[in-house]
């Protein structure tokens, strides 16, 4: 019987070895910095899984790098290690002089370190520049003690699939290109302590969902360009928008911009083929070069009174079917309204035609050309028709009509039934009250009975507005319309 049991155990061990392969695990105990290489001895190039106990420094990280680059190490557990100065050293596991080489193992000219799983210890406060760049890293933890990330610290870890990726509370800045080209995680959770997101920090990732926390003060150029984000609500704490912020986001459908922003910068959300909704706040005075260029589904664009400049190619190739240029408009950049193949009517409220610049890419053409038909009705104020017919850019149109009847209504997005609000007037004030916090920002606009717009924007909570005089007002909130006598 005993012989049968022993034989069975032997068979199990042999079978397990065949099933799991040659797993070479090593539990290293070090007593001082720089000792890891000595402790590993001649096993350094045979280990594929390593746990380290005790103090480690930059020299020990170089040893671990060697175990992976020149050996077989793919799993590294540092949860029991004490890292010198609580900081992962700069280029801890990325040696550019050894990895950027002509080598059969190279991917896009770089040999990626084969470590796939990395466990970091609680207690570390900083991860240095390029510390884990260009690795085949799939899983990593960011300890709660972490307070600082270095530029490029996880750059081009294409296979990073820790999902969701949670940036710990206490982090105030995500530096430039920190997670650029990390393409396998879909949800990003940012902390309430975050103040700054650096240039291209999440460029060309596959993020579908991200929270931009209230308190965020600065986002730099291209931070989320090339992502898979579907919807964005920009927090009110942000006072300025950078260029290329959401450019080339192929699944982006909706953007909410807070009401105090004054400029939509160049290439802000260009080449977003599914973008359908974006609000232009009443505070906006300029829409930058290529801001929404190539957004072939972007259709409802309400331009606010106060807008002065629409720059080169800003709305190029959008799906606009009608538009109202406000009386405040002074400048239309070349190509800014080109290739509007669905346009049916245009209104320009300015009595003096806004200046039209020549298209730098198509000399001789102005803002309107290409697929924009020249025979659609262009409605202009009474007495200004001849000025428009003589003005460069506007003289593109053959059907200029003088009128004093300009559109005042705004089509509003729908609210669900459980978001219906209460609208009433009292003591010269208008009250818009929601029983619950809306699930997403709700468009509203307030007009006098004569058609003068009083206010418009997006609501995320109940709102009170001091009205200018006793009158009857029309209020649009979501898909509901209210008539209030003040």
Please report, for each region that a protein language model flagged, where it lies by residue:
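Bacterial Sec-dependent N-terminal signal peptides
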Residues: 1-25
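Low-complexity, Pro/Thr/Ser/Gly/Ala-rich linker/spacer regions in secreted
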Residues: 20-25, 401-417
């Amino acid at each position: 019987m005993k012989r049968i049991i022993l034989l069975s155990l032997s068979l199990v061990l042999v079978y397990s070895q065949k099933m799991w392969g040659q797993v070479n695990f090593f539990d290293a105990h070090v007593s001082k910095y720089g000792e890891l290489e000595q402790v590993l001895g001649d096993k350094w190039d045979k280990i594929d899984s390593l746990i380290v106990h005790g103090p480690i420094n930059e020299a020990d990280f170089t040893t671990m790098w060697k175990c992976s680059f020149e050996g077989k190490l793919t799993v590294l557990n540092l949860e029991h290690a004490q890292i010198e100065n609580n900081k992962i050293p700069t280029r801890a596991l990325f040696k550019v002089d050894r990895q950027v080489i002509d080598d059969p193992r190279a991917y896009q000219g770089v040999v990626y370190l084969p470590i796939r799983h990395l466990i970091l210890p609680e207690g570390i406060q900083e991860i240095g520049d390029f510390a884990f760049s260009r690795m085949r890293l799939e899983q990593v933890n960011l300890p709660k003690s972490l307070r600082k990330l270095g530029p490029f610290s996880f750059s081009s870890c294409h296979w990073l699939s820790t999902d969701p990726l949670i940036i710990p509370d206490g982090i105030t800045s995500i530096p430039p290109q920190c997670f650029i080209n990390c393409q396998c995680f879909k949800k990003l959770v940012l902390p309430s302590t975050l103040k700054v997101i650096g240039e291209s920090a999440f460029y060309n990732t596959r993020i579908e969902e991200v929270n931009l926390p209230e308190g965020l003060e600065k986002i730099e150029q291209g931070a989320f360009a090339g992502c898979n984000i579907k919807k964005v609500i920009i927090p009110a704490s942000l006072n300025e928008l950078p260029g290329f912020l959401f450019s080339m986001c192929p699944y982006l459908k909706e953007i909410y911009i807070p009401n105090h922003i004054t400029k939509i910068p160049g290439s802000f959300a260009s080449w977003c083929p599914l973008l359908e909704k974006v609000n232009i706040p009443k505070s906006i005075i300029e829409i930058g070069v290529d801001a929404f260029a190539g957004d072939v589904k972007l259709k409802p664009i309400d331009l606010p009174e106060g807008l002065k400049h629409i720059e080169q190619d800003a709305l190029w190739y959008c799906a606009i079917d009608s538009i109202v240029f406000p009386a405040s408009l002074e400048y239309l950049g070349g190509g800014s309204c080109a290739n509007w193949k669905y346009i049916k009517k245009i209104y320009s409220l300015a009595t003096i035609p806004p200046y039209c610049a020549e298209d730098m890419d198509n000399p001789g053409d102005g803002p309107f050309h290409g697929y924009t038909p020249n025979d659609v009705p262009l409605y202009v104020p009474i007495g200004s028709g001849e000025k428009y017919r003589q003005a460069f850019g506007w003289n593109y149109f053959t059907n200029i009509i003088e009128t004093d009847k300009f559109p005042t209504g705004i089509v509003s997005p729908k609210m669900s039934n459980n978001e219906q609000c209460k609208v009433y007037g009292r003591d010269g004030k208008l009250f818009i009250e929601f029983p619950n916090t809306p699930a997403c920002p709700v468009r509203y606009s307030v007009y006098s009975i004569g058609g003068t717009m009083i206010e418009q924007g997006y609501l995320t909570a109940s709102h009170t507005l001091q009205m200018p005089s006793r009158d009857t007002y029309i209020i649009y909130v979501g898909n509901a319309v209210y008539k209030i006598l003040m």
